[in-house]
């Protein structure tokens, strides 16, 4: 018994009695130092087991090691509902959700590769002058002495020490100090002058001042005198001296610091922070290291010039209100001979400029609200107010408000490089640090391969170890399929899958051992071509001496794992059990929903015929945003279109950043600007665009499927019509848990109360008054067919379909939720507990329930994220229903089950990043498979061949 226990705790992670969310008191054993895949349908309990049980307990144990004082600042960790977990190593979770939105965070800073770049340039970079382009030089005093003796031998010269360079001031005190030290001459703004008592300059002009340390005819005989004078000049000039040729009046600079010998420009000794755009010493002074500056978008501030300011022509101000800013604008208009009711297009340009940008003139404010008093006030303008809200530490809502009137433009000073001129003037093998950061990872890796040959011996000695670290980290990024990214790519622009794989590469590079890693679908956004490299990376993490748990649905990942835990049998209340645990080989021999898809007994069938569409097209011509190569693309309407291609090939740029914003601006006056394109045709053939993504349907537990689909309003209206409600005079608000009246006021309609436990985790307990039902006693007394409003919210969709079968207005909205495979979730289930796949299907169901014209364009970006084979089958059924109504669906997808089910494919590539951005193929899946063009074709051909063999 003791031996078994030791084996269990030493070789396995043992979870006993897990009851988090829908887990049904399950026991699971996961082998340590192995690659384990947890799979199952969406909502079956995979994430509840991996993240909400195993990771949550690991994190809680870590925090428990801190003192009570430290835990007070860290926040409380809730104890997961589990009896016991043994064999748990320190846990690191690598999820998709934690994308960094900080504009200063880049791929380079996240992976720490940019830190090594900074070190490399600070220690081995060659400095060049940003004024003349000359290589910067620095000398010792002995070298300067030798150079002067060689270059000026026999010439009459002045030895100068610079004191002031291009600064305003009268410098009366400085001249007096120089005079008292015994110096007789100075050079002011290029002119030699004798110092006199009371000497001063024009204080409002820029001046350069050098003191004449010595004047002499240079000769070897006077070497000692020159050496002494040079020493004094170096001290006075802080390491910099000038030699003035008395005959030609030419000046040459010499410095102990890095210096341009032509212009005298000098740099301080470089340090790593001089190359950081997050440091004042390295950042571009104009954009503060962001690479972009805020500019006002006048088309968004004044979208309709035919309106007057009074009528709300300046959208940022809205319609006229009795407030100071409108009184000031009235005064400005009066000054220019117009009124606040004049159409904006008829207001003089000078007047509009002052309204937007302010005026130095103090305006006389007259208004009835001020009585007979007159006020004279300065006016700063609408523009300054908007920019102030955006750039100051205003509230998030104020910044969001200002953001809609602002467009980001590339910084004109640094051209988007983020760094100051000095930092950009250091080079290694002809490249500055920003140019390296702009290279794709694959391109950068190739460039670094031959770099040693281009370095001098000193540089090579310094750079060898740094280059080794950089190459190592780049190799890990290449292994996880991120060859198309660049170091300067902003973290905020990365997809969840990309940011997750970056963190995975960083963890592999950290070489930690005895750690438990938990990953959430790392294959998201990854083309089949790159899947093998990802799997090898996970195995490398395992072989280093770590345990790896992956929540995944990818077939190749499951078959490559050491161990598989299959959750099910279905989802929600019908899930939460372990239906299989063992090796992939063992799994293929058992009868579960997952194994039936893996062994080929069940499959998603290829459509018998492809839709041809309605003969109409939307065509984009000349799309050139990001890496798109000025492409022309036509989308056949009335079909299911799938956009494919390797990661970074331009799929999202074409659909999410070009097509969707064009249509959103056309139909909804959206504020998001599309990326560059020449023209769009056929826009009249659709009447709206809908993006069905996997984002939550609500941000608070008060949001649920009933409220999102709108069926809750119908249910509340039904309750209002009941005789009991009419007698009591109840209105629809009575049956809402969000407003006072019908809700339980003890818990404010939450159904539970939060008990603060100080240094222990907060505890959620059911409300003692409503017992979790959210409503007060009087509201719950009103019943329909024996059920209160709380009972109905507690029903699953399947139960609700039966219950409301005779009420068409309610049934139509609930039935579609059942049709998309969500029969197991509750009507009142908090939106925060729904998975991404479940949220997406709630949105799809809502669209299916709408009465539509058959002219809608739907966009879905990787809808199979988080979906099991069975979920994908149901999803495709829902998508096909929408297309059968005449609508058009564009799906960005790598999943071959979706690709083979499409009517029309647009394959992008051939590679990612700069080597992508072309349309390789358009046509049916069969035609692409036959063509052999690009990386998608061979995988699709294999999939279609398997399907054809089974027919």
Language model: regions and residue ranges:
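Conserved phosphate-binding elements of NTP-dependent enzyme cores
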Residues: 1-951
């Amino acid at each position: 018994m003791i031996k078994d226990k030791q084996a269990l705790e030493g070789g396995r992670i043992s979870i006993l009695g897990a009851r988090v969310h829908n887990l049904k008191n399950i026991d699971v054993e996961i082998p340590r130092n192995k690659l384990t895949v947890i799979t199952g349908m969406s909502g079956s309990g995979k994430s509840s087991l991996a993240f909400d049980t195993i990771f949550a307990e690991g994190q809680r144990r870590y925090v428990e090691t801190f003192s009570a004082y430290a835990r007070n600042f860290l926040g409380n960790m809730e104890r997961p509902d589990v009896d016991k977990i043994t064999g748990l190593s320190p846990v690191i979770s690598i999820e998709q959700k934690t994308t960094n939105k900080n504009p200063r965070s880049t791929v380079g800073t996240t992976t720490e590769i940019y830190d090594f770049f900074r070190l490399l340039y600070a220690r081995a970079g060659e400095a060049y002058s940003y004024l003349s382009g000359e290589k910067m030089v620095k000398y010792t005093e002995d070298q300067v002495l030798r150079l002067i003796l060689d270059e000026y031998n026999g010439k009459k010269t002045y030895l100068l020490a610079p004191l002031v360079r291009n600064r305003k001031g009268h410098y009366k005190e400085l001249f007096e100090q120089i005079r008292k030290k015994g110096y007789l001459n100075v050079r002011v703004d290029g002119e030699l002058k004798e110092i006199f008592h009371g000497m001063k300059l024009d204080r409002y002009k820029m001046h350069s001042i050098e003191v004449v340390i010595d004047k002499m005819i240079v000769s070897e005989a006077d070497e000692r005198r020159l050496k002494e004078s040079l020493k004094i000049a170096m001290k006075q000039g802080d390491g910099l001296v000038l030699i003035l040729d008395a005959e030609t009046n030419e000046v040459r600079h010499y410095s102990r610091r890095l210096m341009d010998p032509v212009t005298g420009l000098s740099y301080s000794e470089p340090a790593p922070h001089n190359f950081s755009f997050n440091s004042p010493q390295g950042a571009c002074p104009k954009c503060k290291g962001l690479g972009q500056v805020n500019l006002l978008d006048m088309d968004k501030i004044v979208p309709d010039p035919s309106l007057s300011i009074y009528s709300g022509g300046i959208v940022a101000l809205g319609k006229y209100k009795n407030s100071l800013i409108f009184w000031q604008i009235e005064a400005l208009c009066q000054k220019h001979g117009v009124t606040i009711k004049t159409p904006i297009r008829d207001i003089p340009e000078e007047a509009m400029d002052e309204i937007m940008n302010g005026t130095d003139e103090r305006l006389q404010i007259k208004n009835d609200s001020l009585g007979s008093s007159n006020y004279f006030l300065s006016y700063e303008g609408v523009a300054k107010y908007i920019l102030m809200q955006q750039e100051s530490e205003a509230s998030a809502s104020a910044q969001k408000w200002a953001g809609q009137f602002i467009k980001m433009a590339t910084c004109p000073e640094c051209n988007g490089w983020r760094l100051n001129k000095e930092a950009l003037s250091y080079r290694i093998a002809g490249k500055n640090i920003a140019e390296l950061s702009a290279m794709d990872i694959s391109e950068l890796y190739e460039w670094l391969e031959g770099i040693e040959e281009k370095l001098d011996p000193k540089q090579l000695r310094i750079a060898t170890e740094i280059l080794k670290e950089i190459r190592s980290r780049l190799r890990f990024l290449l292994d996880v399929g991120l060859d198309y990214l660049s170091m300067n790519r902003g973290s905020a622009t990365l997809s969840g899958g990309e940011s997750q794989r970056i963190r995975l590469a960083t963890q592999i590079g950290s070489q930690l051992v005895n750690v438990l890693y938990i990953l959430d679908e790392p294959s998201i956004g990854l083309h089949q071509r790159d899947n093998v490299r990802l799997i090898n990376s996970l195995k490398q993490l395992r072989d280093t001496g770590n345990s790896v748990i992956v929540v995944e649905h990818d077939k190749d990942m499951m078959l490559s794992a050491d161990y598989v835990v299959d959750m099910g049998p279905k989802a929600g209340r019908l899930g939460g059990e372990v239906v299989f645990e063992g090796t992939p080989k063992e799994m293929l021999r058992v009868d579960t929903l997952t194994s039936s898809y893996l062994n080929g007994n069940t499959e998603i069938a290829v459509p018998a015929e492809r839709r041809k569409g309605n003969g109409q097209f939307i065509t984009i011509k000349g799309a050139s945003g990001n890496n798109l190569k000025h492409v022309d693309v036509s989308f056949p309407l009335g079909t299911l279109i799938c956009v494919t291609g390797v990661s970074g090939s331009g799929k999202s740029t074409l659909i999410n950043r070009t097509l969707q914003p064009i249509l959103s601006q056309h139909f909804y006056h959206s504020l998001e600007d599309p990326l560059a394109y020449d023209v769009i045709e056929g826009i009249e053939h659709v009447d709206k665009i809908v993006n069905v993504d996997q984002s939550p349907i609500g941000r608070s537990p008060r949001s649920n499927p009933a409220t999102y689909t709108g069926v809750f309003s119908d249910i509340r209206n039904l309750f209002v019509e009941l005789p009991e409600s009419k007698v009591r005079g109840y209105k629809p608000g009575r049956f809402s848990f969000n407003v006072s009246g019908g809700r339980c006021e003890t818990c404010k309609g939450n159904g539970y109360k939060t008990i603060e436990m100080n240094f222990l985790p907060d505890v959620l307990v059911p409300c003692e008054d409503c017992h979790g039902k959210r409503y007060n006693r009087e509201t719950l007394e009103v019943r329909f067919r024996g059920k209160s409003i709380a009972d109905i919210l507690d029903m699953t969709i399947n139960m609700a379909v039966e219950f409301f079968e005779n009420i068409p207005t309610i049934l139509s909205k609930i039935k579609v939720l059942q049709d998309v495979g969500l029969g197991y979730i509750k009507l009142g289930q908090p939106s925060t507990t729904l998975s991404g796949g479940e949220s997406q299907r709630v949105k799809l169901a809502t669209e299916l329930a709408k009465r539509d014209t058959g002219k809608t364009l739907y966009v879905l970006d990787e809808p199979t994220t988080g979906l099991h084979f069975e979920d994908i089958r149901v999803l495709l059924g829902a998508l096909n229903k929408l297309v059968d109504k005449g609508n058009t669906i564009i799906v960005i997808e790598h999943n071959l089950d979706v690709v083979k089910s499409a009517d029309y494919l647009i394959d992008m590539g051939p590679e990612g990043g700069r080597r992508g951005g072309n349309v390789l193929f358009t046509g049916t899946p069969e035609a692409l498979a036959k063509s052999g063009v690009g990386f998608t074709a061979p995988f699709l051909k294999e999939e279609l061949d398997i399907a054809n063999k089974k027919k």
